[in-house]
């Protein structure tokens, strides 16, 4: 089974659909002044919903560096759902303050910030790497990322814009990761080194989360196998 992340959630209703249908990760945009930026009070409500829908997860035990991301993905599948807050080039102190206030499980870094500065906290880490420009950086940082509960994300430059990646680069990926970038329920690729799928616009209709598309994406994502 692959990890499925529904991102850009702004409402309790969309979160409820994602949780009830087995999404492993729910993503909320906490970058100011974006179309999908969530109200902090709504984010707190969703954090409570996520925690109510799971047992207290066991501490991630870690493992070999070569299998680390695979083990993190399996831990997420077995113990989720988890709430992810998406940040972009925001001060580290602000990121951690908001993460603690909301009650996040994971921090997703979507800008040019130094990902390694965010290691060693109580939060899991989902660092975004631009394909193909930052694949060398991912290879360089992958060993350091195994120091925490982390899962790399491959995406386009900004993300959330529905732009498909050039999947020929995925086949040559030096490590395992989750995939974003223009995904829909109809176009999920299967690669040995892809551990999951991240979607936002691909489950929307006219800019609003579409329950039927969310359900279909989760079903299709979980049905994919390496």
Curated annotation (Swiss-Prot):
Cysteine pairs forming cystine bridges in this chain are: none
Q: What's one GO MF term for it?
A: phosphoribosylanthranilate isomerase activity
Involved pathway(s): Amino-acid biosynthesis; L-tryptophan biosynthesis; L-tryptophan from chorismate: step 3/5
Keyword check for Lipid metabolism: no
Top-rank EC class of the record's enzyme? isomerase
| Keywords noted in UniProt | Amino-acid biosynthesis, Aromatic amino acid biosynthesis, Isomerase, Tryptophan biosynthesis
What's any GO biological process attached to this entry? L-tryptophan biosynthetic process
State its Enzyme Commission number(s).
Answer: 5.3.1.24
Q: Which reaction does it catalyse?
A: N-(5-phospho-beta-D-ribosyl)anthranilate = 1-(2-carboxyphenylamino)-1-deoxy-D-ribulose 5-phosphate
Q: Which family does it belong to?
A: Belongs to the TrpF family.
Identification of the protein by name: N-(5'-phosphoribosyl)anthranilate isomerase
Q: Which organism is it from?
A: Candida albicans (strain SC5314 / ATCC MYA-2876)
């Amino acid at each position: 089974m692959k990890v499925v992340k529904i991102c850009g959630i702004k409402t309790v209703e969309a979160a409820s659909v994602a949780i009830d249908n087995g999404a492993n990760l729910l993503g909320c945009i906490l970058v100011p002044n974006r179309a999908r930026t969530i109200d902090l009070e709504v984010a707190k409500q969703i954090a409570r919903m996520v925690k109510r829908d799971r047992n207290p997860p066991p501490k991630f035990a870690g493992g070999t560096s070569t299998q680390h991301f695979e083990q993190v993905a399996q831990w997420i599948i077995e113990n989720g759902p988890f709430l992810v807050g998406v940040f972009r080039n925001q001060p580290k102190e602000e990121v951690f303050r908001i993460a603690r206030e909301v009650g996040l499980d994971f921090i997703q870094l979507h800008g040019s910030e130094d990902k390694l500065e965010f290691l060693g906290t109580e939060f899991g880490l989902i660092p975004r790497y631009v394909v193909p420009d930052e694949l060398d950086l991912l290879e360089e940082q992958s060993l350091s990322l195994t120091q925490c509960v982390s899962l790399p994300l491959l995406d386009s430059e900004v993300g959330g814009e529905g732009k498909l990646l050039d999947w020929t680069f995925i086949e040559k990926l030096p490590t395992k990761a989750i995939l974003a970038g223009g995904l829909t329920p109809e176009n999920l690729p299967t690669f040995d080194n892809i551990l999951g799928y991240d979607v936002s616009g691909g489950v929307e209709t006219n800019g609003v989360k579409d329950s039927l598309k969310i359900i279909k994406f989760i079903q299709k994502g979980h049905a994919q196998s390496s």
